């Protein structure tokens, strides 16, 4: 997948349906991305790199597109994929996945949570997959975290909406930079009345 020669929102949309795979050394976990958010670097008041901010914790954002930027928020590990050439500091937050298979190990990692609650949030799926900050700064597909763009799915419909948890950021609070597979029950904060059967949210053929 090209993480450099397209806009970050375009990449965030194209990641929906892509298969993400993580191997923790003992178990392999996989799922299809159903929710992403784009962060547009130095101009984006919600981005960690806003105004060119550079601290030790955000250095990975300044690397080439395809780098993993991991950070912890409220004890939750969040995984972002860096986009654009080195120094641009834009990226895509992976907010939720539809598991290829919910395994007993995933349920154990989520302290007994079952069903959609296993992976329907940015800190939930990373815990289910037993991820750690050791991923920060690594290259996608060159270590334990990879994506498969051939075994992917294609959303029947994509919704665009404001990002979650971005208050008091002026126009950036309201920009439609969150992308979701419409109706997929694994999308975070999905109302039950809006949920469809997961298989009905994907195109039957490309």
UniProtKB/Swiss-Prot annotation:
Enzyme Commission code(s) on record: 3.2.2.-
Entry keyword set: DNA damage, DNA repair, Hydrolase
Record's keyword annotation contains DNA damage: yes
Any GO molecular function: DNA binding
Membrane-spanning ranges: none
Gene3D superfamilies in the cross-refs: Methylpurine-DNA glycosylase (MPG)
GO biological process: base-excision repair
HAMAP family: 3MGH (MF_00527)
NCBIfam families: 3mg
Membership in a protein family: Belongs to the DNA glycosylase MPG family.
Official protein name in the record: Putative 3-methyladenine DNA glycosylase
Organism this protein belongs to: Staphylococcus carnosus (strain TM300)
